[in-house]
Amino acid sequence: MKYILSIILFFLLAGSLSAQNEQDQVIFKAMQDEMQRSKEQLMLPGMQKPYYLSYTLGRTHQFEVVGALGGVTNFYESPWSAVGGVQMFLGDYDHNNDINYVCASVQAGMPEQADYDVIRRNFWLGSDAMYKWSLQAGAMKDAYLKANPKTAEEAVVKDQQKVDAVTRIEEPKNAYTIDRVKLENIVEELSAIFKDYKDIYDSSVAITGQEMEVYKSTTDGVVLKEPLRYA
């Protein structure tokens, strides 16, 4: 019998509570300034303004070491990259445009480094696209509810619950390092084991890792940063 075997190793790393650094301040200020502008000024004539916005920004950096039969076949380390997301609701907490309660969002490209002007501009573009989508979704929802009214029990349930303002900034306890020599030695040692198993015709060992930072800010006063790491 022949087998295809792939081994992937994961070691989770945790984070701790800390204060904002300079990069955090740039990112959060760009998010909050554009979010406030959108809440106050984003409106088409005769249409609703957004009452709630949520911006997220994720920065990520990753690597992969792959080997087979005692040798390293590939090593890859990516530069930092970033992507943002815009969520928006029109109406109010009792009745908004969220159709099917899926919390739809629009993706927004972000710069590799923390650049206030670029981050703010890209959230502006994402907010504009999300506003137009939200108007369409709200019209669809209103038309559906007109044809299918809520029951008395359903009518008292709000579309969205307002949460208390909170600020939580987490930083990792230790620096995230990629020891290429050590990782390649591990891959070589583990992948060499399969030389003795002739019935395994295609084997590989991979060690992958990712360092990620997730930022979130909402008009409800929620400010969050969370590091996500494995290697």
What is each PLM-predicted segment?
Residues 6-16:
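Bacterial N-terminal signal peptides
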Residues 1-5:
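Positively charged n-region of N-terminal signal peptides that target proteins for export
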Residues 18-231:
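Active-site bordering "gate/hinge" segments
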